[in-house]
UniProtKB/Swiss-Prot annotation:
Residues 802-819 have a biased composition (Basic and acidic residues). Pfam families: P-loop_SecA, SEC-C, SecA_DEAD, SecA_PP_bind, SecA_SW. It comes from Clostridium perfringens (strain 13 / Type A). May bind 1 zinc ion per subunit. This is Protein translocase subunit SecA. One of its GO terms (molecular function) is protein-exporting ATPase activity. It catalyses: ATP + H2O + cellular proteinSide 1 = ADP + phosphate + cellular proteinSide 2. The gene is secA. PROSITE patterns: SECA, SECA_MOTOR_DEAD. The keyword Ligase does not apply. ATP binds at Q85, G103, E104, G105, K106, T107, D492.
C-alpha cells in the first residue's frame, strides 16, 4: 500500500464512503416498507414504472426501489440485504465492477440493481458461467421478481427460437455468455425480422466477470458451416511431424505456446513433400497443416488441454478444468489433434459469423460485473471496458490464515509433502480442498492418496456431472476433495457441523497458476462469511510457471542451500520471486489481449456497418430507392473504369467491352452498339444506360407487383450481403495472420491491417452492389410469393480458440476479372495496367 493510500484510504475506501449516505437513506425507508401489505409492495413496481415514463431517473428512485426490493426479499426468500450488500448493489447499478469475497451473497446483491433497471422496461441480462447456475438463479431469485410483478426468463442450450424470444422479452433474462453471444450472431443472419429473438442490448450484469471478460476474452464466438476442404492433408502432416526430432528438426517455444521447424526440419519437409521452396507462397496450405500438426503433437497435452471422449476430442477449459462441450479449436488445430489421436478427422468449418466477448459486451448501454477477484486486473477492466473496480467490505472480518508458500526442489518432493500434509490433517477431521492445474495432475495426486488408503473425491472435467454435488460437501468433517482449478465455482462450500472447532476448511494449492487471480479464487473458497480457514501453496522448481518464467536467482539460491528432495524453503524473497513471475505472465497476456483487440476493433467497425445496413434492409418497407441507387452506382463506376482517361485510339474497343460487361449484369443483349454510342459523351452514355436499366426494372416490377418485388429485393440483398461478408471474414483473417510476417518499416502492423482491411471492405461493398443488381435483373420471377429461406444453414457453433499460426488463404469464388475492369487489388488502375500485366 502506497503512502497516499495510507493517508487518504484506497480508491475503493473513498468510493464506499461516498456511497454510504445512499445506504443510510435506504435503511431509513425500511420501517415504511415493512408497513406495506404484499399487494401494496407489488404496486410499488407499477408506480416506479409510471414515474420513469414521466421522466424521473432511476438514480432518483434508487433508495426507494432498493428498499422495496430488500423488504420483498425478506418476505419471499427470508433474506434481508446487509448494508454491505446494498453498497454492492449501488456499485453494480452505476455500471462498475463490485469485488465481493466468496460467500458474501453476490446472487442476492444482484437483485437490487436488476430490479431497479428492469423498471425501464428495456430488459436486463444476468450472465452466469454455466446453464446450471443460470437455471438455479432464475428459479431462486425469480420468486422475488415475480412477487414484485416482474417477469423472468432463462436462455439455455436447446431452446427453440420461440422459447428464446419469450425469454428475451421478459423483464429479466438469465443465461450464459455463449448463449447470449450466439443469439446476437444468429439474429444478424436472419432473412425476416420476425425470426430475431433478442431486443437491443440495454443493461447487463456479468457474474464471475473476470472469468468471462478476461479469461475468455481471447476466444471468439464462431458460427460455422461445413467447409469443402479434404481432411487427408491433416493425416499426412501428422505422419510427417511424428518422425521429427526435437531441437534437430523442430523447436518448442513454451512461452508463445508454439512449435516451429528448424532449417533442417524445413529441408526434411521439402524432401518429404517433393517441393523446392517450403517458404514459397504456393505452399502456404502445406505450411499451415505442418504448423498445426507440430502444435498438436508437441505443444497440446492430452488430459491437460483436451481429452479423448467417445472417440472425439473435447477441449478442457484451462481456467475451470471443465469440458467445453460443443466447442472446437479453430484454424484447423482441432483437426490436427484428431489426426494425432487417431480419431475421425472432421471437415474444417467455414466461419459464417464471429464476434469476441470483448466486443459483444461493449455493445450494452450499461455493463456491470461482480466477482471475488477483480482488483489484480483493474487496469485491463478500465482500459478495455471502461469499468472501474470497487472492493466491497466484507460483512464479517476475514479470519482465514494464508500461510507462506513452501518451495521444493522437485515435483516428487512436493507431492510427497502434500500427501503427508493431507494425511496429518485428515487425522484431525479438518476438511481439505486441494486445487490442481490439470486433470492429469489431479489424477496423479489421487493415485498417491489411493496407495496410502486415504478416502477422497476427485472433481475434474471427467466427472463434470457431479460437480455441484461434490463441491457442496467439500466443507464437511473429514472430507478430502481434489479439484481441477476453479471447478465448482458458483457453488458455496458451507462448513459442516464441528468443522469450525478443527480450524475450518484447509486449502492446499499444488502449484501457482500463471494468474494471481486464479490463486486468490482458490484461497477464497475457505473463510467465507468470517469463518476460520487455512491456505497454503506447495511449489516446486519443476512447475511450469517456475520453469518457464521463474528467476534464475531463485534456482541458484536453492542450489546453494543444497536442499534435499523432501526439504522446503519458506521466505518472503521466494514469495516475491513467484509473484514477479506471475506479474510477468499477466502483463504478457494483457498485451496479447490488447493487441488482439486492436485487430478486432477494425473488424468490429466493419461488422457494425454491415449489421446496421442489414437491419435496415430487414426493417425497411421500401427498398426501391436503395436498389435504384445501386443500379446507378454500378453503371457510373463501370463507365468511369472503361472510358475514363483513355486514349482516343482505345475508345471504341473499351466501349465494346463496357457494353458486354453491362449486358452480362443488366442490359439487354443487342440493345446498344458501339456505332450508335461512339459519338456520345461519357455522361450521355451513362444516362442512356441508366434510363434503359430503369425501364427494364420497371417492367419486371409491373409484371410481378410492387409488394412482391420488394420481397424479392429484400431476400436477394440479404443473401448477397451474407455471402460476401462470410468471404470477407475469411479474407480478413488471412490478412491478420499474414500481416505480422511482413517487414513493415516504420509502420504498425495494426495500422497496416486497418488500411488494407478498409480497402478490402470497400471492394466488398462494391461487389455487393454488382452481384445484387446482377441477381435482381437475372432472377426469374413468377407472380407468387417468394419462398422464405435462410442465407446459410447453420451447421455448428463453436467458441473457438485463437491461433497464431499462418492461415491458409481462402479461395474466393468471384467472377473472372476482365482486362479493362478495375484491378481488384484496390490500386484504382485497370487490371491490364496493374496485376493483369503478369497474366498471359
Amino acid at each position: 500500500m502506497g503512502l497516499f493510500d495510507k493517508i487518504f484510504g484506497s480508491y475503493s475506501d473513498r468510493e464506499v464512503k461516498r456511497i454510504t449516505p445512499i445506504v443510510d437513506k435506504i435503511d431509513s425507508l425500511g420501517p415504511e416498507m415493512e408497513k406495506l401489505s404484499d399487494e401494496e409492495l407489488k404496486q410499488k413496481t407499477f408506480e416506479f414504472k409510471d414515474r420513469y415514463a414521466k421522466g424521473e431517473s432511476l438514480d432518483d428512485m434508487l433508495p426507494e426501489a432498493f428498499a422495496v426490493c430488500r423488504e420483498a426479499s425478506t418476505r419471499v426468500l427470508g433474506m434481508k440485504h446487509y448494508r454491505e450488500q446494498l453498497i454492492g448493489g449501488i456499485v453494480l447499478h452505476q455500471g462498475r465492477i463490485a469485488e465481493m469475497k466468496t460467500g458474501e451473497g453476490k446472487t442476492l446483491v444482484a437483485t437490487l440493481p436488476v430490479y431497479l433497471n428492469a423498471i425501464a422496461g428495456k430488459g436486463v441480462h444476468v450472465i452466469t458461467v454455466n446453464d446450471y447456475l443460470a437455471t438455479r438463479d432464475k428459479e431462486w431469485m425469480g420468486q422475488l421478481y415475480e412477487f414484485l410483478g416482474l417477469t423472468t426468463g432463462v436462455i439455455v442450450h436447446g431452446l427453440t427460437n420461440d422459447q428464446r424470444r419469450e425469454a428475451y422479452n421478459a423483464d429479466i433474462t438469465y443465461g450464459t455468455n455463449n448463449e447470449f453471444g450466439f443469439d446476437y450472431l444468429r439474429d444478424n443472419m436472419v432473412i425476416y425480422k420476425e425470426e430475431r429473438v433478442q431486443r437491443p442490448l440495454h443493461y447487463c450484469i456479468v457474474d464471475e466477470v473476470d472469468s468471462i471478460l478476461i479469461d475468455e476474452a481471447r476466444t471468439p464466438l464462431i458460427i460455422s458451416g461445413a467447409g469443402s476442404k479434404s481432411t487427408d492433408l491433416y493425416k499426412i502432416a501428422d505422419f510427417f511431424v511424428k518422425k521429427l526430432r526435437e531441437e534437430e528438426d523442430y523447436t518448442i517455444d513454451e512461452k508463445a505456446h508454439a512449435a516451429m521447424l528448424t532449417d533442417k526440419g524445413v529441408a526434411e519437409a521439402e524432401k518429404a513433400f517433393g517441393i523446392e521452396n517450403y517458404a514459397d507462397a504456393n505452399n502456404m496450405e502445406l505450411q499451415h497443416h505442418i504448423t498445426q500438426a507440430l502444435k498438436a503433437n508437441y505443444v497440446m497435452k492430452r488430459d491437460k488441454d483436451y481429452m479423448v471422449k467417445d472417440d472425439e476430442i473435447a477441449i478442457v477449459d484451462e481456467f475451470t478444468g471443465r469440458l467445453m462441450e460443443g466447442r472446437r479449436y479453430s484454424d484447423g488445430l482441432h483437426q490436427a489433434i484428431e489426426a494425432k489421436e487417431g480419431v475421425k478427422v472432421q471437415r474444417e468449418s467455414k466461419t459464417l459469423a464471429t464476434i469476441t466477448f470483448q466486443n459483444y459486451f461493449r455493445m450494452y448501454t450499461k455493463l456491470a460485473g461482480m466477482t471475488g477477484t477483480a482488483l489484480t486486473e483493474e487496469t485491463e477492466f478500465r482500459e478495455i471496458y471502461g469499468l472501474d473496480v470497487v472492493v466491497i467490505p466484507t460483512h464479517r472480518p476475514v479470519q482465514r490464515q494464508d500461510h507462506s508458500d513452501l518451495v521444493f526442489k522437485t515435483a516428487k518432493g512436493k507431492y510427497d509433502a502434500i500427501v503427508e500434509e493431507i494425511i496429518e490433517t485428515h487425522k484431525t477431521g479438518q476438511p481439505v480442498l486441494v486445487g490442481t492445474t490439470s486433470i492429469e495432475k489431479s489424477e496423479y495426486l489421487s493415485s498417491l492418496l489411493k496407495k496410502k488408503g486415504v478416502p477422497h473425491k476427485v472433481l475434474n472435467a471427467r466427472y463434470h456431472e457431479q460437480e455441484a454435488e461434490i463441491v457442496s460437501h467439500a466443507g464437511e468433517l473429514g472430507n478430502i476433495t481434489i479439484a481441477t482449478n476453479m471447478a465448482g465455482r458458483g457453488t458455496d462450500i458451507k462448513l459442516g457441523e464441528g468443522v469450525l472447532e478443527v480450524g475450518g476448511l484447509k486449502i492446499i494449492g499444488t502449484e501457482r497458476h500463471e494468474s494471481r487471480r486464479i490463486d486468490n479464487q482458490l484461497r477464497g473458497r475457505s473463510g467465507r462469511q468470517g469463518d476460520k480457514g487455512h491456505s497454503r501453496f506447495y511449489i516446486s522448481l519443476e512447475d511450469d510457471l517456475m520453469r518457464i518464467f521463474g528467476s534464475e536467482k531463485l534456482q541458484s539460491v536453492v542450489d546453494r542451500l543444497g536442499l534435499e528432495e523432501t526439504e522446503a524453503i519458506e521466505s518472503k524473497m521466494v514469495t516475491k520471486s513467484i509473484e514477479n513471475a506471475q506479474k510477468k505472465v499477466e502483463g504478457n497476456n494483457f498485451d496479447i489481449r490488447k493487441t488482439l483487440l486492436g485487430y478486432d476493433d477494425v473488424m468490429n467497425k466493419q461488422r457494425e456497418v454491415i449489421y446496421k445496413q442489414r437491419s435496415q434492409v430487414l426493417e425497411g418497407e421500401n427498398l426501391e430507392d436503395s436498389v435504384q441507387a445501386m443500379i446507378e452506382d454500378v453503371i457510373t463506376n463501370a463507365v468511369q473504369a472503361h472510358l475514363g482517361n483513355i486514349d482516343e485510339d482505345d475508345f471504341e474497343k473499351e466501349l465494346g467491352d463496357l457494353i458486354k460487361y453491362l449486358e452480362d449484369i443488366m442490359l439487354p443483349h443487342g440493345k446498344f452498339t458501339v456505332e450508335e454510342l461512339k459519338t456520345n459523351s461519357n455522361e450521355e452514355i451513362t444516362r442512356k444506360f441508366i434510363e434503359c436499366a430503369r425501364e427494364i426494372y420497371k417492367e419486371k416490377e409491373e409484371f410481378v407487383g410492387s409488394e412482391q418485388m420488394r420481397e424479392i429485393e429484400r431476400v436477394i440483398i440479404l443473401r448477397v450481403v451474407d455471402t460476401k461478408w462470410m468471404d470477407h471474414i475469411d479474407d480478413m483473417d488471412h490478412l491478420k495472420q499474414g500481416i505480422g510476417l511482413r517487414a513493415y518499416k516504420q509502420q504498425d502492423p495494426i495500422q497496416a491491417y486497418q488500411m488494407e482491411g478498409s480497402a478490402m471492405f470497400d471492394e466488398m461493398i462494391n461487389n455487393i452492389k454488382i452481384d445484387t443488381v446482377r441477381y435482381l435483373f437475372h432472377v426469374k420471377v413468377e407472380a407468387e410469393k417468394p419462398q422464405r429461406e435462410r442465407v446459410a444453414k447453420e451447421t455448428g457453433a463453436s467458441h473457438g480458440g485463437d491461433s497464431q499460426e499462418i492461415k491458409k488463404k481462402p479461395v474466393k469464388k468471384e467472377p473472372k476479372v476482365g482486362r479493362n475492369d478495375l484491378c481488384p487489388c484496390g490500386s484504382g488502375k485497370k487490371y491490364k495496367s496493374c496485376c493483369g500485366r503478369e497474366v498471359v
